[in-house]
């Protein structure tokens, strides 16, 4: 009897490689677990281990310097990090998944701005439409208070979901009768963090509230909340 085995795909090979990286990083995270809980966020040492291993960008396509993993392989990495420390696993999941969504749905120009070059962006934040935005030339002016920004202490770009309003303060409606909702990303320095994460569980996720106060966001890093068609796909 002859048994024919299929050769693992390049994606599967990368998945195994990044899972091995996660196992190595997990040892560092486990040693930092007490400090992560004490400081309510991922420690600099744990962050650096995740970043050096390229794990924040497991869902970012290779053309932007990421791993380009499929979703199953990516969540095996998340599981491995979560096994070492639950809070770190949650924050890391929030970072890696939001980063994958951001690069997939924003314009190529925006993706290049955020993820191109040696200092690839890490995203975090609440993208449900809790804020408000007014259309201006080239983008929007956005305001709002947002909650539960897990992994935000080490993120470089912060997400904000908002409903578009007209000059009279009324929501702009789409042709289907639904409000025009958008997601955008701001450099971290344009966001005010409120430092109010004091909880019993998942302490180390750093899920702080934050405020966006009349900030301009360009179209290049903004996209429709309920779009189901990514600009860039891993498949």
Task: Give, region by region, the residue ranges found by the protein language model.
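Glycine-rich flavin
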Residues: 44-52, 57-156, 166-176
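Short secondary-structure boundary/capping elements
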Residues: 17, 41-42
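Short, flexible segments with low predicted structural confidence
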Residues: 20-23, 53, 183
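N-terminal capping segment at the start of a domain
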Residues: 25-33
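Basic/polar N-terminal segments that are highly enriched at the extreme N-terminus
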Residues: 1-20, 24
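FAD-binding core of flavoproteins
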Residues: 123-235
